[in-house]
């Protein structure tokens, strides 16, 4: 499950142009503005006791499902998302020439994986082994300067720990919703990652990394365990080769220890990246290899790592 943070947050501000297609409501009852919006986006599907409710500048969705494949999905107890003047953008004649909303918030509660393998025993065992996860994020945006601050986007589980990301991003000055939807490019000035790992890394991040690492490579390997070990060696050598002006001795040691402990980095990890020349980012720049390549080449890096 990929979490491409800038894209997720900006999509709430740029996807309204594609959310105006109406579908017939059951019993000819008119759809609410939030129902029309969600129907047009086609991101969430109804689960048992599904409900949608409009709130000022936002929507609440209860008991939905996000499908990620033919045999796997994620059930969600509740989603709350709010945007500055959201109801204006959900009107019959929205003005997409306006600047993007200056603030937005999303809270996703009770996320659990649901297996749909066709084997009732396997699906049941998987369901009772799930622990709920919650996700929250908040952003502020200044259209005049193009400054976008993603504040503490956090995923949290009472069982697996938590991880949070914050970032400072620069968008085109005075960009409209329409222009951002047509050309979603930006530059990244800083990125902060916090991880309290008690299994969260292995449950969410590692499957994505394994899927990426298992792609056919120059070694000819397609086994994720082998290729993750290969990537671990490559990244370690890259960190060792970084100049002291980019990472100090203490941070270098902490980062190498974190990499060494893969795939089970049990403990507290912090990573701060700062770019003197902001790094260009776009929808085509979100692959792990590209992010790591840019970060290792251009960012000033500060790291702490404490084993639990």
Regions from the PLM with identified roles:
Residues 6-15:
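Bacterial N-terminal signal peptides
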Residues 1-5:
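Positively charged n-region of N-terminal signal peptides that target proteins for export
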Residues 20-308:
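Glycine-rich, small/hydroxylated-residue low-complexity segments
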